[in-house]
Amino acid sequence: MVEEHRDVIYVTSNYVPGYRAVEVLGFVYGLTVRSRRLGGQIDRFKSILGGEIKEYVTMMEHSRQEALERMLDHARELGANAVISVRFDSDSISDIMQEILAYGTAVIVEPEE
């Protein structure tokens, strides 16, 4: 599936269907770090019982979107109009912080003829 954010196309595949890459500009990424403290004891209690922590899910969705937007801004700075091989990664920095990374390869694409 091809997505477009303002003027930059992004895909998880190694190419954009219907386009050809005419220049590879390099690695781009967007990073955000968020605190996981969301009510302390209530969240611990929910996790013991196995329930979903909706506040945490919402925070992670917003973090993922922010990392994606930062990656696309990085691509724009390089002059790209597309990012291929887009991936996300997540890691805990400590007991209270979560890191979200969006990354891919910035390219210039043109429609195939």
From Swiss-Prot:
Q: Which family does it belong to?
A: Belongs to the UPF0145 family.
What's this protein's name? Answer: UPF0145 protein MTH_544
**Which species does this protein come from?**
Methanothermobacter thermautotrophicus (strain ATCC 29096 / DSM 1053 / JCM 10044 / NBRC 100330 / Delta H) (Methanobacterium thermoautotrophicum)
